[in-house]
């Protein structure tokens, strides 16, 4: 999935970055800027930065849930797809493992101390069970889509850490923005990729399932580093609608997103998009 999305994203970022560069070439008087282009600085050994790769590693699975989840990852080459997409897009400053592992919990996370992405085997297995309870005829499909969506969220943490990017606000909310930013880039035809939009919407569906299971937020949920799941649902729906109000009008027409929020979503996503183009463009590979 990510190997298909990556070229779309890179094209969109190239167009956006070119537009920003052209705008920056002139100041208010129309004079050309003398600023030098951003390039990768060499390290102490004289080699350019950004030669790292995301490398897939599978660990053993022993529990029923972990064995099932590992099979999902391997049968569909999900971790390989995630790694290939990241390697296509980004000049990583070092090798970064993406590790499939038994965690004995339902999770997926960027491990700051180990500097590796950890995709728990229990995660897709549990999500398949969650979506089966919604009477979805093929619960594996939304389980995989939601797993990709959560990977993009964790990729946001990874990029912030790897490139020491500035973050204003709660990092968990910012990581959700990264997922939306990646998935809502238009192709050369200026249209969003339908499957990518569906991944984001399925991620919102997952947060809605969790919100329903957790019930009314209590003090601990409001104090948590994550926004309450229901808030995250509305954020993702807002950004999907804001990226393409006409193409994603059903989000509002079906009453999934309040009109009072929807009217501001186009500007909201535009701000997010421009911010992440600015932050990530220096670290993108040139193809």
Which role fits each region the language model picked out?
Residues 14-17:
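C-terminal motif of bacterial Sec signal peptides marking the signal peptidase cleavage site
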Residues 168-187:
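An active-site-proximal "capping" alpha-helix that borders the catalytic cofactor pocket
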Residues 140-160:
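Short alpha-helix carrying the canonical HExxH Zn2+-binding catalytic motif
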Residues 42-59, 63-64, 218-287:
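Pan-zinc metallopeptidase signature
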Residues 1-8:
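Bacterial N-terminal signal peptides that target proteins for export
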Residues 184-237:
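Active-site/pore-lining binding-face segments in mid-to-C-terminal subdomains
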Residues 19-118, 123-133, 274-287:
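A metal-dependent hydrolase signature that marks the N-terminal structural subdomain at the beginning
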Residues 94-110, 174-178, 192-212:
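Acidic helix-start/capping segments at beta-turn-to-alpha-helix junctions
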